Amino acid sequence: TEAENIRNVELQGVDMIGFIFYPKSPVVCADARDLPACAKRVGVFVNESKENILMYTDRFSLDYIQLHGNEAPEYCRSLHNAGLHLISFSILLPKDLLSVSAYNGLCDYYLFDTKTPQYGGSGNQFDWNLLHRYNGPTPFLLSGGINPYSVKALREFRHPYFA
């Protein structure tokens, strides 16, 4: 069951577990009983209204909000000002790193993931080497095709702002 999966993941010592609140996703969080006891709860949203994000945050006691759509800095500012902890960003090319500066101070973390035309996880491996060019003040998390074969590279990845 989903609850068993969450407990098993939590037993691995993870810091955060993401829950999808995007209706078009094949995996959508619907039951508060399935939430982790210790790991931080991250709600993943795609172009969702502020009102719905606030409602889900309250209902599921979310610790972080991951924005995975086309959210503008002004929108992130309104969520940040409402007291929400934000995680956001997808990049494709080195030049995409330049656009993150507009979000400085609005996101608690950036999640650098592979940018694709569709929303959600593509399974495409993200080129973490692009991040050696990142020198912003916001710490970041990695995503993008993480699997058992990439764990070694993930553990070896070093950057002063890698959380």
Please state what every model-predicted region is.
Residues 1-163:
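Conserved N-terminal beta1-alpha1 strand-loop-helix module at the mouth
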